[in-house]
């Protein structure tokens, strides 16, 4: 079947409320509020509610712990400002992928998409949904651990539901994100206000001598920063959907400037609230810090905490799915994945094949269950690609002076972020060397085999296999190649 023009087949444009003529491509459905909600909703998952102790464990006192949380927020903001320059200079979806392509060529871009799409993003999606499932199941299995099969089935159902919602409508996906972000901000506000009230009542014992017993070694401080910045991961999510942002030149930087400082303030104030009712030792021993806080402060309404933590995790999962599907779509459009993964639903105008592919890979990761170590070992790879991308920003200042830059950050900002990236790449390897890091590097480099076989040389036998797959999936899912918007 030839890839016929979709203009004759577009019959259901009523699902997209606009008087402008539509092409079968991703539509600009995401405004400033939705952009802020994507950033906030994706960064704030379950970690700050369940286990904000990773930073404290490495600093061993309250004062340095709060300073690290604030410093990590500043660094995340600096990194996001660099991505704002990139996103307004190269207005393509896909996050780091188009920037690496423009700065260094197809091979680094392919290795990024290979690593992200096969390991990092679907495994993170699976972990978030498993966390959601465990919190929901806990309400029905009081006093005992829920069966693993039940947890996995509920997590798989959550993945299917989120994938379906985002495949049905961009607008519906963004509305769901807005609702769950509002829900998590409600519980954040409850914890912060309760903490401030307790602080005003004189619960300041844990803030006295707050630097006593602090760890000052380079190794401990580096691990504290590493864990803190991991909690801020997601600051670049809006760059994955640049093509769907209304007025990206304005809304992308504004969403960053509003969203990340908001998260930073929330993280600092929530930690302060926790320390008003828990000593550092008690916080480190708590299995779920927000639940412990709720039991001590909000009783008999403490049940709202696990409920809203579940809302928070499902919101983070929705934001992750919403943005990651665009990376698959862009990689397919560039010929770095199956071409059908870049196709658009005729009726829904969503990257449905990319989202379905992403959901299937995430469900596969649920089967073994314990994939936290996989994500931990691959997290240094995330900073490898962050650093390469921002290095590309510096390189393009000299090699692509012709590109228009609506936003241009001072050169010291990307240099700082590059140095931090190098530090975060080397810190876990030096402090806790393990063979797994070598395996991660080998996996990343193994993408070169697939690149040269299927992308660079494009062997005929591979095309003979992919063509019937594309043909049947196109008919089954009612999808077509994306068109360019009319100028």
UniProtKB/Swiss-Prot annotation:
Expression (tissue specificity):
Outer medulla of kidney (at protein level). Kidney and small intestine. In the kidney localized to the apical membrane of the proximal tubules.
Q: What Pfam family does this protein match (any one)?
A: AA_permease_2
UniProt main location, coarse: membrane
Return the annotated region ranges for Disordered: 1-23
Binding-site residues, L-arginine: 43-47, 233
Chain ranges sitting on the Cytoplasmic side read 1-31, 85-110, 239-251, 326-351, 392-410, 451-487
The subcellular location is: Apical cell membrane
Q: Which residues lie on this side of the membrane: Extracellular?
A: 56-62, 138-147, 194-217, 275-302, 432-434
* Keywords associated with the record: Amino-acid transport, Cell membrane, Disulfide bond, Membrane, Phosphoprotein, Transmembrane, Transmembrane helix, Transport
Q: Composition bias, kind Basic and acidic residues: at what positions?
A: 1-20
Per the record, its GO cellular-component terms are: apical plasma membrane; brush border membrane; plasma membrane
Q: Where are the transmembrane segments?
A: 32-55, 63-84, 111-137, 148-169, 170-193, 218-238, 252-274, 303-325, 352-370, 371-391, 411-431, 435-450
Q: Which InterPro entries match?
A: AA/rel_permease1, AminoAcid_Transporter
Q: Which GO terms describe its biological process?
A: amino acid transmembrane transport; amino acid transport; L-cystine transport; neutral amino acid transport
Q: Does the keyword Nucleotide-binding apply?
A: no
UniProt similarity note: Belongs to the amino acid-polyamine-organocation (APC) superfamily.
Q: What is this protein called?
A: b(0,+)-type amino acid transporter 1
